[in-house]
């Protein structure tokens, strides 16, 4: 199968990434990727931008180098299951990932992580949970993924985690998480987690996982731009006028 949407990418605005959004779009165009979400880190992450950065994404063109640009954010899970963007930001974004990051949420125990994930799902402020395979943030797979399925929050399959070079120990956990998502009928999304433009849309490890466990493509929201936009509608997001031509 071929993934056509990358829902987790970074620009240099994240503080530890190295490309502009124009460079990311050019790389996506060269690859033939029709759509990606730009999801820089929210402000609690060291080096990340002020929340005004996300409010002002309205100035971004909807297409750059003929690639559809979805305005997003990778928010940090903090406290007992909050996210670190003000409520006023929500209306400016098309897509929000919530993720654990050690500098913001020190690793605790499975129960604490599970409770935080369930709370953030139930807040209805996030569309996906990012890189859940990280062994530093163990959680009850069944409880969290069942809750995500109930609330139509996507579970991210993260290509960077599956490479095994960061968040060491994630690979087997990613496979197990995907199997539980398949069993419980949860939606999954796919993110390169690119911090450099040449990694945009690179999904060899994720595509292998999907093929290996025969994950149903109707639950892979990034299989086509239309499936992704249909998922946004399911989540209650307003239609994006400029993307109507992609709904075929």
Curated annotation (Swiss-Prot):
Its cofactor is Zn(2+). Keywords: Hydrolase, Metal-binding, Zinc. Zn(2+) 1 binds at residues 8, 10, 74, 193. One of its GO terms (molecular function) is phosphatase activity. Gene3D superfamilies: Metal-dependent hydrolases (3.20.20.140). HAMAP family: YcdX_phosphat. NCBIfam families: PRK09248.1 (NF006702). This is Probable phosphatase VFMJ11_A0899. It comes from Aliivibrio fischeri (strain MJ11) (Vibrio fischeri).
């Amino acid at each position: 199968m071929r993934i056509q949407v990358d829902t987790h990418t970074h620009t240099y605005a994240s503080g530890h990434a190295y490309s502009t959004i124009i460079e990311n779009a050019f790389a996506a165009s060269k690859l033939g990727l029709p759509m990606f979400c730009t999801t820089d880190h929210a402000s609690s992450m060291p080096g990340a931008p002020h929340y005004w950065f996300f409010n002002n994404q309205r100035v971004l063109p909807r297409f750059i180098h003929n690639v559809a640009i979805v305005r997003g954010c990778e928010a940090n899970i903090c406290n007992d299951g909050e996210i670190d963007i003000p409520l006023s930001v929500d209306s400016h974004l098309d897509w929000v990932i919530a993720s654990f990051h050690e500098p913001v949420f020190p690793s605790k125990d499975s129960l604490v992580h599970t409770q935080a994930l369930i709370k953030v799902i139930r807040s209805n402020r996030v569309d996906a949970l990012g890189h859940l395979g990280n062994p530093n943030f163990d959680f009850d797979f069944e409880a969290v993924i069942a809750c995500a399925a109930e609330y139509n929050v996507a579970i991210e399959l993260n290509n960077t985690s599956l490479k095994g070079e960061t968040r060491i120990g994630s690979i087997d956990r990613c496979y197990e998480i995907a199997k539980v998502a398949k069993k419980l009928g949860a939606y999954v999304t796919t993110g390169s987690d690119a911090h450099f433009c040449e990694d945009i849309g690179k999904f060899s490890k994720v595509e292998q996982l999907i093929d290996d466990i025969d994950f149903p493509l109707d639950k892979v929201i990034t299989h086509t731009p239309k499936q992704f936009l249909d998922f946004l509608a399911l989540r209650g997001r307003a239609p994006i006028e400029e993307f109507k031509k992609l709904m075929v």
